[in-house]
């Protein structure tokens, strides 16, 4: 059922469909489902805010972390905080009421904040992959990665994020409640006259999903080849084999993290867009949307907490200046010293 600035995934033959801006949507799913949604968002806030905020705090406290290669990791933490503060808190409030109680303006603000955080996070992963490829594989022999390049990378993520999130505010597509109607996203559901949704959805899939996916696969594929070549050149010693396994594991985690975050959402959105009028339940889009939002937790774990340097500094901060695991960390890093150039450049290892 399509209405002014909303789309309910349910036929109105019985006359029960109501505007998600004005009435509870308990006819879509059981009221308990809204409580589960609110609890899940609370879980994301409780875990997502501290780990991302701690990343920023630890970087401010430890000067050795303020290197150009780490700028993009900080940007990733900022993007995740943007999602937590601008999107998750709103969804908790609306799920408690069972509908998008904040109205049309609130929908625009929530949709913009959550989508901007998600897009900046996505493009941060792209820039991170490119930076690692440039540093490890050295496609430009005389190139030296510096602060200006890092700032350019961060600026690119915000520019691409805004290029995706501003158009729906000015008439190219729009933000509408989605799934259980408690959070807002880009309109993949309708071809409403005057909004040019078709062209915007194609633009999103080509420029903000397919292209980033190709870049990430290319960069990490080349990086794995470079690490294997370096290990072979050192005659496959135990230390180089261990470093190679670590880098391979981290690359696989990075790619899986990206796919888990964005592939379900993109696939379902594309299906809905290409099957206009087909029947689907409210959970059909709700679950993939919150797969994407859960990246606020597992992005920091993959890219920051598993980074040896960040992890050591984080433990030092948490334990008031002393890392109780310092001996183990030091022993581990000594064992892989022979291949530190390759593994540290990949960074999350």
Curated annotation (Swiss-Prot):
InterPro entries: GPCR_opsins, GPCR_Rhodpsn, GPCR_Rhodpsn_7TM, Opsin, Retinal_BS, Rhodopsin, Rhodopsin_N. The record marks 110 as: Plays an important role in the conformation switch to the active conformation. Disulfide bonds join 107-184. A motif ('Ionic lock' involved in activated form stabilization) lies at residues 131-133. The modification N6-(retinylidene)lysine is found at residue 293. It is a multi-pass membrane protein. It is found in: Membrane; Cell projection, Cilium, Photoreceptor outer segment. The chain crosses the membrane at residues 34-58, 71-93, 108-130, 150-170, 200-221, 250-271, 284-305. Residues 326-349 are annotated as: Disordered. Keywords: Cell projection, Chromophore, Disulfide bond, G-protein coupled receptor, Glycoprotein, Lipoprotein, Membrane, Palmitate, Phosphoprotein, Photoreceptor protein, Receptor, Retinal protein, Sensory transduction, Transducer, Transmembrane, Transmembrane helix, Vision. One of its GO terms (biological process) is G protein-coupled opsin signaling pathway. The keyword Transmembrane applies. A lipid is attached at residue 320 (S-palmitoyl cysteine). Residues 331-349 have a biased composition (Low complexity). Residues 59-70, 131-149, 222-249, 306-349 are cytoplasmic. Residues 1-33, 94-107, 171-199, 272-283 are extracellular. Glycans are attached at residues 12, 197. Photoreceptor required for image-forming vision at low light intensity. While most salt water fish species use retinal as chromophore, most freshwater fish use 3-dehydroretinal, or a mixture of retinal and 3-dehydroretinal. Light-induced isomerization of 11-cis to all-trans retinal triggers a conformational change that activates signaling via G-proteins. Subsequent receptor phosphorylation mediates displacement of the bound G-protein alpha subunit by arrestin and terminates signaling. Belongs to the G-protein coupled receptor 1 family. Opsin subfamily. This is Rhodopsin. The gene is rho.
């Amino acid at each position: 059922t399509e209405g002014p600035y909303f789309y309910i995934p349910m036929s109105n033959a019985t006359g029960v469909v109501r505007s998600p801006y004005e009435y509870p949507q308990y006819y879509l799913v059981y009221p308990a489902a809204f409580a589960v949604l609110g609890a899940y968002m609370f879980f994301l806030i409780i875990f997502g805010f501290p780990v991302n905020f701690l990343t920023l705090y630890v970087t401010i406290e430890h000067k050795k972390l303020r290197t150009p290669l780490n700028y993009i990791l900080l940007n990733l933490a900022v993007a995740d905080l943007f999602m937590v503060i601008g999107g998750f808190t709103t969804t908790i409030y609306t799920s408690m009421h069972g509908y998008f109680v904040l109205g049309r303006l609130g929908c625009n603000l929530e949709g913009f904040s959550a989508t901007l955080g998600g897009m900046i996070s996505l493009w941060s992963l792209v820039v991170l992959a490119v930076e690692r490829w440039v540093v490890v594989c050295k496609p430009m022999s005389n190139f030296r990665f510096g602060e200006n390049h890092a700032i350019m990378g961060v600026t690119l993520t915000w520019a691409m994020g805004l290029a995706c999130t501003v158009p729906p505010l000015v008439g190219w597509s729009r933000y509408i409640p989605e799934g259980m109607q408690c959070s807002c996203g880009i309109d993949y559901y309708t071809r409403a006259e005057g909004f040019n949704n078709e062209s915007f959805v194609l633009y999103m899939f080509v420029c903000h999903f397919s292209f980033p996916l190709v870049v990430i696969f290319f960069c990490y594929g080349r990086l794995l080849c470079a690490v294997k070549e370096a290990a072979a050149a050192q005659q496959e010693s135990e230390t180089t084999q261990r470093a190679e396994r670590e880098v391979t594991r981290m690359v696989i985690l990075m790619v899986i993290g990206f796919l888990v975050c964005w592939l379900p959402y993109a696939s379902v959105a594309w299906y809905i867009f290409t099957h206009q009028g087909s029947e689907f339940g409210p959970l059909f889009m709700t679950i993939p949307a919150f797969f994407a939002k859960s990246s606020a937790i597992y992005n920091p774990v993959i890219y920051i907490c598993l980074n040896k340097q960040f992890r050591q500094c984080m433990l030092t901060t948490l334990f008031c200046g002393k890392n109780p695991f310092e001996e183990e960390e030091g022993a581990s890093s000594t064992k892989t010293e022979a291949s530190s150039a390759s593994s540290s450049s990949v960074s999350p290892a």
